């Protein structure tokens, strides 16, 4: 609901700022993870595509580690699907064909500063 209270033009601008910040942090995280990770951190591979898009493959997820430790694995599908909802409302493009939270070997995330995505996963994802 909180996202819905923000005016739509502001959401689009916020989405671009958020993803550009996320992009910079992902590049830094690639270097930082070489020195080891916190037990609840993410292990990623980042790739710049162009000014509008980038990809992150997540091979270790902090949410999954945390959920397993505290017996809360049932929350994972909902947590995993939040990426779609946020991108949908902020006017960003997002797609993912594999998801760790559904038992796949990685989350293959494709982000676009300007793009479209469904509010929830489609196709074979649960």
Description of each model-found segment:
Residues 15-19, 76, 83, 107, ...:
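Solvent-exposed, non-transmembrane amphipathic alpha-helical segments
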């Amino acid at each position: 609901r909180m996202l819905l209270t923000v005016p739509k033009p502001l959401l689009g601008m916020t989405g671009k700022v958020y993803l550009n910040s996320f992009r910079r942090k992902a590049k830094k995280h690639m270097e930082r993870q070489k020195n080891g990770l916190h037990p609840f951190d993410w292990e990623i591979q980042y790739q710049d595509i162009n000014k509008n898009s980038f990809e992150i493959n997540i091979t270790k997820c902090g949410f999954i580690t945390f959920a397993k430790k505290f017996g809360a694995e049932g929350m994972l599908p909902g947590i995993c699907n939040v990426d779609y909802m946020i991108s949908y409302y902020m006017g960003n493009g997002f797609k993912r064909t594999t998801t760790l939270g559904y038992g796949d070997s990685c989350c293959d995330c494709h982000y676009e500063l300007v793009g479209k995505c469904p509010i929830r996963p489609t196709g074979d994802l649960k």
